[in-house]
Structures are given as structure tokens and as C-alpha cells.
């Protein structure tokens, strides 16, 4: 069976992004998001368990929401009253229930990058 995982790296400090709040949503055909999980990254910037695995893995559209402003404020970063990046949504599709989907996020208070990992 496949699985979904993530890994968040803080490129401003050169460290894993520990204690970042992440939410996983499944997007219904109507476009309505359904909250599946709320997690917090561990000391390695990962989740302690896959976000989806086994019977939870279904084809469809999903969205990960990363609470980056909250994370950087917790690290003591001086952010504007309206931070440039607050919440980063990454919407993606799962086409193969048996596939491994890894969604890394490399992030600073001013930029981010993602890709499909393995």
C-alpha cells in the first residue's frame, strides 16, 4: 500500500522545521475541503507517522496547509504585522493508491519551494 508524507525544512535557519502545524484536507468534487488530520512536525521536521497510509490512501485531490508565520514567530523571527507568508496551501492529486507521495516544503519567511519526492 502507498503512503503520503511530508518534510519541512527551514531554509532561513538551515534546520528542520520542528513544531510546525500542518493540516491535511481532502477536496470534495464540489471543491469543499474536508479536514482529515492536524499534526505538528517533530524535531526532524517530519510527522511521526505517514499522513495517509493503507486504507486511508484514496485517489483524489488533497491539500496540505502549512502554518509558516506561526512557526517563524515562534522562532523569534521579526515578521510584519501582515506577514508575507502566513499559511502555505499545497494542493495536489493522488492518482495511485499504491504510490508513495512525499511532499517536502523548503521555507523561509519570504519564499518556499516544493516538489514531489519519493
From Swiss-Prot:
It catalyses: 5-hydroxyisourate + H2O = 5-hydroxy-2-oxo-4-ureido-2,5-dihydro-1H-imidazole-5-carboxylate + H(+). HIU hydrolysis also occurs spontaneously, but more slowly. It comes from the Bacteria. GO terms for biological process: purine nucleobase metabolic process. Pfam families: Transthyretin. PROSITE patterns: TRANSTHYRETIN_1, TRANSTHYRETIN_2. Catalyzes the hydrolysis of 5-hydroxyisourate (HIU) to 2-oxo-4-hydroxy-4-carboxy-5-ureidoimidazoline (OHCU). This is 5-hydroxyisourate hydrolase. It comes from Brucella melitensis biotype 1 (strain ATCC 23456 / CCUG 17765 / NCTC 10094 / 16M). It is an enzyme of class 3 (hydrolase). Its EC number is 3.5.2.17. Keywords: Hydrolase, Purine metabolism. Substrate binds at residues 7, 46, 115. InterPro entries: Hydroxyisourate_hydrolase, Thyroxine_BS, Transthyretin/HIU_hydrolase, Transthyretin/HIU_hydrolase_d, Transthyretin/HIU_hydrolase_sf, Transthyretin_CS. One of its GO terms (molecular function) is hydroxyisourate hydrolase activity. Homotetramer. Belongs to the transthyretin family. 5-hydroxyisourate hydrolase subfamily.
Amino acid at each position: 500500500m502507498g503512503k503520503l508524507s511530508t518534510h519541512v525544512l527551514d531554509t532561513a535557519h538551515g534546520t528542520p522545521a520542528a513544531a510546525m502545524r500542518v493540516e491535511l484536507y481532502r477536496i470534495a468534487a464540489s471543491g469543499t475541503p474536508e479536514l482529515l488530520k492536524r499534526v505538528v512536525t517533530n524535531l526532524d521536521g517530519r510527522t511521526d507517522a505517514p499522513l495517509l497510509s493503507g486504507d486511508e490512501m484514496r485517489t483524489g485531490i488533497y491539500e496540505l496547509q502549512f502554518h509558516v508565520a506561526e512557526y517563524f514567530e515562534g522562532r523569534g523571527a521579526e515578521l510584519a504585522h501582515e506577514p508575507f507568508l502566513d499559511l502555505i496551501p499545497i494542493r495536489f492529486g493522488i492518482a495511485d493508491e499504491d504510490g508513495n507521495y512525499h511532499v517536502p516544503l523548503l521555507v523561509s519567511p519570504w519564499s518556499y519551494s516544493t516538489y514531489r519526492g519519493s
